[in-house]
């Protein structure tokens, strides 16, 4: 097999890169370890920045998103008996976010790829990357017991935190930055109307809570829990009771409860690896960085990586400026670290940490009061929440 760009991973970042390249006439093949149903079964993020919405539109996969996505012009933070709304649209110069689940984004991209006939190999086992620093890298993998080889010009590693792509870079070439948080999020998905038309983030003495949504009829709620907690110890009734206890009373009274479609506990981590490239291998998305979900940045950072890599590949193929690809990591990391900072900050001011003393607790409350009581503070939150601009590539 032969292609121009080999893409490892058929999650949203790999599929989005593949679709953009296909529309630009650049041949690509995607290799995915799992089945399509497994990929679609992942319950993930649902808040899309303006930049990602624009990128999906550019890729020609925005029809269902335009119809079913919920445009949010604001977000609310509740703390210390107060509720403060942040007017995202006014404070960011007209930008908004769109609530549209990652599962739906993935489905749209899968259908678009199938319709255009581009190659995706699912259940590709024993994937290995070779000659990454040479002129002609290649990928080997197994499919139905047969060992196959895929020759290419470049490899995009879009296979997530546990994927083979980052593992294919010599450890001594990488610098890892990481913070693991001492709690997780217990999330519940239910076919109940959302308690609010905008997201509500709550800082409460019992711990953080988030009221989110996937559609006008499907809600997603989260509560902060210790890492020692097990999902099976949380009945639906226990979850709803705990959620209500952490929300402002007027919100809790309106909460519509119902049977859970899914419950899971996600640990929280900040993680960045530098550099994000090695020879002709380029890491994108969770393969290179993880953010705690508090800032809704994970999927959106993957999209900005994809945008950067796509535009650099266009320069390489259309203008013969392959040397620009050497700037990929530096361009991406400038935006990534700003999103890491915002996600860390949101996590720090909204959660209860097990070692927090009275002084730290008062500082946390004052931090929220300052940012939410100041036009400059509100604007800072808003511009980060809707997404910082993508860097132009000359």
From Swiss-Prot:
Q: Which UniProt keywords apply?
A: Aromatic hydrocarbons catabolism, FAD, Flavoprotein, Monooxygenase, NADP, Oxidoreductase
Q: What is the effect of changing residue 300 to D?
A: The side chain of Asp300 moves away from the flavin, disrupting the interactions of the carboxamide group with the flavin O(2) atom, and the alpha-helix H10 that begins at residue 297 is displaced, altering its dipole interactions with the flavin ring
Any extra remark in the record?
Controlled catalysis is achieved by movement of the flavin and protein between three conformations: in, out and open. The open conformation is important for substrate binding and product release, the in conformation for reaction with oxygen and hydroxylation, and the out conformation for the reduction of FAD by NADPH.
| Positions that bind FAD | 13, 32, 42-47, 102, 286, 299-300
- Pfam families (UniProt xref): FAD_binding_3 (PF01494)
Function in brief = Catalyzes the incorporation of an atom of dioxygen into p-hydroxybenzoate (p-OHB) to form 3,4-dihydroxybenzoate (3,4DOHB). The reaction occurs in two parts: reduction of the flavin adenine dinucleotide (FAD) in the enzyme by reduced nicotinamide adenine dinucleotide phosphate (NADPH) in response to binding p-hydroxybenzoate to the enzyme and oxidation of reduced FAD with oxygen to form a hydroperoxide, which then oxygenates p-hydroxybenzoate.
Instruction: Note the subunit structure.
Output: Homodimer.
Cofactor: record remark: Binds 1 FAD per subunit.
Q: Read off the InterPro entries from this record.
A: FAD-bd, FAD/NAD-bd_sf, HB_mOase, RIFMO-like
Task: Provide the catalytic activity annotation.
Answer: 4-hydroxybenzoate + NADPH + O2 + H(+) = 3,4-dihydroxybenzoate + NADP(+) + H2O
EC number(s) for this protein? 1.14.13.2
Q: Where is this site: Important for catalytic activity?
A: 201, 385
Where does the chain bind substrate?
201, 212-214, 222, 293
PANTHER family cross-referenced by the UniProt entry: P-HYDROXYBENZOATE HYDROXYLASE (PTHR43004:SF3), TRK SYSTEM POTASSIUM UPTAKE PROTEIN (PTHR43004)
Metabolic or biological pathway, per its Swiss-Prot or TrEMBL entry: Aromatic compound metabolism; benzoate degradation via hydroxylation; 3,4-dihydroxybenzoate from benzoate: step 2/2
The cofactor(s) it depends on are:
FAD
Annotated GO molecular function terms are:
4-hydroxybenzoate 3-monooxygenase (NADPH) activity; 4-hydroxybenzoate 3-monooxygenase activity; FAD binding; flavin adenine dinucleotide binding; oxidoreductase activity
NCBIfam families according to UniProt: pbenz_hydroxyl, PRK08243.1
State the family it belongs to.
Belongs to the aromatic-ring hydroxylase family.
Superkingdom field: Bacteria
BP GO terms, sorted? benzoate catabolic process via hydroxylation
Q: Which organism is it from?
A: Pseudomonas aeruginosa (strain ATCC 15692 / DSM 22644 / CIP 104116 / JCM 14847 / LMG 12228 / 1C / PRS 101 / PAO1)
Give the result of residue 220 to Q, as annotated. Lower affinity for p-OHB than the wild-type
Q: What does the record say mutating residue 45 to G does?
A: The positions of the substrate and the flavin are not altered
Query: Under what name is this protein listed?
Result: p-hydroxybenzoate hydroxylase
